[in-house]
């Protein structure tokens, strides 16, 4: 009998906790913020065809966005 009461209590407690989570707006893990000092995206570095060779080299060195294009 005690086991049944304990299981019912735990089940009701779990349901209450789930309801509080949904009501509080919690839907999953909190996303990680972008690193400090770096922009979240680099549209200039992503447009490789518009960059000069020196700008492409700077993007490669600073941000790791390397443009491997043959300039003609």
Curated annotation (Swiss-Prot):
Which residues does this entry mark as bearing Lysine amide?
A: 71
Q: Return one GO MF term.
A: chitin binding
A Pfam match is Penaeidin
Which keywords annotate this record? Amidation, Antibiotic, Antimicrobial, Chitin-binding, Disulfide bond, Fungicide, Signal
What's a GO cellular component annotated to this UniProt protein?
A: cytoplasm
Tissue specificity statement from the Swiss-Prot or TrEMBL entry: Higher expression in hemocytes and to a lesser extent in heart, testis, gills, intestine, lymphoid organ and hepatopancreas. Traces in eyes and subcuticular epithelium. Not present in the brain.
Origin: domain of life = Eukaryota
Protein's GO biological process: defense response to bacterium; defense response to fungus; killing of cells of another organism
- Disulfide-bond pairs as recorded: 45-59, 48-66, 60-67
As for subcellular location, the record says: Cytoplasmic granule
Signal peptide range in chain numbering: 1-21
Predominant cellular place of this UniProt entry's protein:
cytoplasm
The free-text function statement in the UniProt record for this protein reads: Antibacterial activity against M.luteus and E.coli bacteria. Antifungal activity against N.crassa and F.oxysporum. Presents chitin-binding activity.
Name the family: Belongs to the penaeidin family.
Q: What name does the UniProt record give this protein?
A: Penaeidin-2a
**Lineage of the source organism?**
Eukaryota, Metazoa, Ecdysozoa, Arthropoda, Crustacea
